[in-house]
Amino acid sequence: MVTTHNLGFPRIGAQRELKFGLERYWKGESSRDELKALGAELRERHWNDQRDLDLAPIGDFSFYDQVLDMSFTLGNLPKRVQGFHGDVLDNYFRVARGRSAQAADEHATCCGGVSAGEMTKWFDTNYHYIVPEFHADTNFSLDPSCLLQQLAEARALGVAGKPVILGPVTYLWLGKAKDDSDRLALLPKLLPVYGALLDTLTAQGVEWVQIDEPILVTELDAEWRQALRTAYAALETRRIKVLLATYFGALGDNLTLAASLPVDGLHVDAINARDEVDALVRELPADRVLSVGAINGRNIWKTDLNATLDWLEPLAKQLGERLWIAPSCSLLHVPVDLASEQKLDPEIRSWLAFALQKLDELNVLATALNEGRDKVADALAANAAAIDSRRRSPRVNNPAVKAALARIDAQLGNRASPYTQRAPKQSARLNLPAFPTTTIGSFPQTADIRQARRQFKSGALDEAGYRAAMQAEIERSVREQESLELDVLVHGEAERNDMVEYFGEQLDGYAFSQFGWVQSYGSRCVKPPILFGDISRPKAMTVEWITYAQSLTNKPMKGMLTGPVTILNWSFVRDDQPRSVSCYQLALAIRDEVLDLEKAGVRVIQIDEAALREGLPLRRAQWGEYLKWAVEAFRITANGVQDDTQIHTHMCYSEFNDIIASIADMDADVITIETSRSDMELLDAFDSFRYPNEIGPGVYDIHSPNIPTQDHIVGLMKKAAERIPAERLWVNPDCGLKTRQWAEVIPALTNMVAAAKTLRNQVQ
C-alpha cells in the first residue's frame, strides 16, 4: 500500500483568520488567550481537512514564521529581547517585528521597541523568514513546549501525524553570524539539542518525524556536505524514524549524499526533478522509504492525474510499501480552498487546484495505486477533461501577442544615451537638492480606503463615487508629503489593493481570485493573480491617477509601476510555456504604460522589481540564463523613454551582492533598496563593484512599527556615503508604507527629511 502524507498546510486560514487575529492582538484589541485559542481552532480545522492522509504534518502551524519557531525551540534568542516583561509569545513577536503587544515596549529604546530580526526570502519563494542570529559564543537549549502542545492537540483529535521540524544543517545555513564566526562551528553544540528533541518525541510515542533539509537542492561545498553527514550520523542512534525532506528543486550533485544519509526515508521534489527518481531507486538502501512529491505544492494548476499515474504505477510495483506520495513541498505557498472562488471564471476555475483540492488529487492517486484506476474512474475522467480544456482553449493563445514578441530586437532595450549623459539632463529638469528624499510608493491603506474598495466591488458605490473617494485619498497623500517637505512625491496608491493584482486585473491573459491568499510574512498576505494566457494591455492602467496627483503639486510626481519580472514572480504562472516568454509579454505591456506616462508629462517613473532576485534558480550554475532574460525584460519595459525622464526601480527583501553586475546592467537611473534591517550590510557589494548610477539605500524598516530617530538615519546614510558618492545618494524608506498607519508614517518621515537636511548642511 502506498502511504500519503503532506509536508505542511497553509496556516493563515481560508478567510485569513490568522492575519486578522494577529493584528487585533498587536493593537491590544484581543488577549493572548484569545490569540492562542484562534491558533488551536485553525489547527483543528486544518487537521480535519487532512484526515484522509495517512500522515498529517504536526508543528507546521506558526504565529509568524516556522524558522523563528525553530529558533525558540532551540533557545536561540537575540540578547536584545531578553529582560523584557511578558511571556515567550511577547519575546517571539519582539524578534519578529520589533515589539510585542506590551505597552512597555513603546519606550524600550529610542525608536520604541527593539530592532526586529532580519527578514529574507525563503529559498526562491515569496515567503519570508526571520533570519537566525549567531555568535561564536551562541548556546542552545531545548524548549519543545510549542511542538508538544500541537502534538497533544492532534492526538486528542485522533490525528495520525508526524512532527515537522527544520533540520540542523539547514537551520545554520539559513542563519547569519553577527560576528566573524563560522556558523558550522556551532554544529557540535546544536546536535545534542536536536538529539534531545528527538528523544522527547520518542518518549511521546512518535513513530515518524519529518526533518526538512532543503539545502540539499542547492550548491553545497565540501564543509556543508560533511556537516550533513556528521549531523545525521549523530542523530541516527535515536529510536525514531526520520523522513528527510527536500524540496524546491533537484538534488543534482547532492543525490548520492542524500541517498546515503542514515535516515529511514527521503522525500524529493518530483515536479522539478522527476528524472532523478530512477537514480534514487537504485541508490537508496532497500529498507528506505522513497517519498515523491507528485503534486505541485507551489502552483495552482490541476495535476494531470492520468499522466502522473502512468509514471507512478511502475514505481509502485517496484517499491511497494516503500513508496510514499505527497505534494512536492509544503502547501504554505498556495491558497486554501478553491471552493471559495464562486466569482472566478468557471472555465479558468476548472483548471485549478488549491491546497484542499491538491489533497483530493493526492487521495485519487493513492486510491488508483492501491485499488486500481477503476475505483476513481469518474475523478480521472473529470480531471482529463479539465486538462484537455485548458490545452485547447483559445483564451490561452493570442496570435497578436506572439507577433509582437517576434518583433523584439536588441535595440528595444537600450536607452538613447548612457547614464553619464542622461543624468545632467534629468538634474536640470528636476532641480533636486543633495540627498533628495522620496518614498517607495504606497501610503497607508486606511479603513476608509478598504471600505470604499469593498463598496465599489460590491456595487454599493458607483464609479464616480469611488473615483472621488480615491482622489480625496490621493490629495491627502500629496498634502502630507508637501507638509513633510519631501522632494519627489508619490500618489500613495490608494486605488491599488496589491502591487501585482492591480495590474493583473487590467491585463488580458490574467484572472484573479477573491480568496486566493497566501502568506508572505507574519500577518502579511498576498493574493497572486493567475497568469493563464498570453498577456496584453487593452488600455492605460495608471495614467489617470498619476496625472491627477501631478495636477495637485509642482513637485515631481513619480509614476508607479510594477515591473515584468516581479509581476511574473508574484503571480501563479502558466506552466505550458517557458517563464521567459511570459515575462517578455509582460515587458511589452508595461512598456506601453511607461510611454503613456511619459507622454502625459510624468518626469519620474518607478518600475518596481522587488522580486528580481527571488526568481534566481537555487543553483548558481543556472543563474546566467535567468538573469539574461530578466534584465532584458526590464530594459524593454523601461528604456523607450527620453534622456530627461528619470527611471527608478526598487528592490526589497533582496540580498543582491552576488548579482550586482546584472542590477547595474538594468541601467535604471536610480535604484532604491532594502538595507536597514541588515544595518547597511547589503551595501558591502559596493566595496568591490563601482555602481555607476544613483542609489537610495532604505534608512528605516517599514515592516516594524518602530520610529527611527534622525540620528539613526544620519548614521546609516554616512555608512552609505562611505561606499557611494554623496552626490548619487537618495534618502528613502526600505519599502512602501501600505501596511503602516499614518501615526507611524508621519513621525518617521519627519525624522527622515530632517536627517536629509542635516546631511546637506554637512556636505556644503
UniProtKB/Swiss-Prot annotation:
L-methionine binds at residues 440-442, 493, 608. It catalyses: 5-methyltetrahydropteroyltri-L-glutamate + L-homocysteine = tetrahydropteroyltri-L-glutamate + L-methionine. Pathway: Amino-acid biosynthesis; L-methionine biosynthesis via de novo pathway; L-methionine from L-homocysteine (MetE route): step 1/1. Pfam families: Meth_synt_1 (PF08267), Meth_synt_2 (PF01717). Binds 1 zinc ion per subunit. It is an enzyme of class 2 (transferase). GO terms for biological process: methionine biosynthetic process; methylation. The active site is at 703 (proton donor). 5-methyltetrahydropteroyltri-L-glutamate binds at residues 16-19, 121, 524-525, 570, 614. InterPro entries: Cbl-indep_Met_Synth_N (IPR013215), Cobalamin-indep_Met_synthase (IPR006276), Met_Synth_C/arc (IPR002629), UROD/MetE-like_sf (IPR038071). HAMAP family: Meth_synth. This is 5-methyltetrahydropteroyltriglutamate--homocysteine methyltransferase. The lineage of its organism: Bacteria, Pseudomonadati, Pseudomonadota, Betaproteobacteria, Burkholderiales. The gene is metE.
